[in-house]
């Protein structure tokens, strides 16, 4: 026993989860992501802390709704990186990118997914881990979705384009 009163077992307890943390860090940096499309998103969107686009209208709209600065920057950079022209927040309309904030209840997410799939739009669901009900719905969306999904713990990206069925949890 150490002078602190903690046994060796108590001091090494955190090592139990080390492998999953290392794997997440590895994927977050883009290593182990075998899709060039998603790898570019990880490197050019998730790892950037400053705005890369000249137009920052999505950034301003998300900040106005109380979304964290880092998430606003990432989503604005995603819109610029993917070349999306139009976007919508919490409404189903003809655009390239739809963002569902916490204002969209978990039981209303499935109509957004169906609309995005029908119109081949990209859907972003913010805070998929906020509560158990929201996560259950998001997990079902990922399981049934025919294309690529990217979950970076802050939001879930549901792509409806040329990509094959792949699930990335970063």
Task: Show which residues each predicted segment covers.
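A short alpha-helical cap/connector motif
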Residues: 1-119, 129-170
């Amino acid at each position: 026993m150490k002078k602190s009163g903690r046994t060796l077992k108590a001091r090494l307890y955190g090592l139990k989860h080390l492998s999953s943390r290392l794997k997440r860090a590895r994927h977050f940096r883009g290593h182990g992501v075998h899709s060039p499309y998603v790898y570019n998103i990880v490197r050019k969107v998730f790892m950037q802390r400053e705005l890369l686009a000249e137009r920052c209208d999505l950034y301003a709209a998300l900040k106005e709704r109380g979304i964290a600065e880092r998430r606003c920057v990432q989503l604005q950079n995603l819109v610029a990186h993917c070349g999306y022209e139009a976007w919508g927040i919490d409404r189903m309309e003809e655009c390239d990118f739809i963002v569902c904030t916490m204002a969209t209840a978990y039981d209303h997410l499935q109509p957004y997914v169906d609309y995005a799939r029908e119109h081949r739009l990209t859907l972003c669901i913010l805070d998929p881990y906020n509560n158990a009900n929201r996560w259950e719905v998001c997990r079902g969306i990922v399981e049934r979705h025919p294309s690529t999904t990217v979950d970076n713990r802050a939001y879930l990206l549901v792509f409806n384009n040329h990509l094959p069925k792949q699930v990335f949890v970063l």
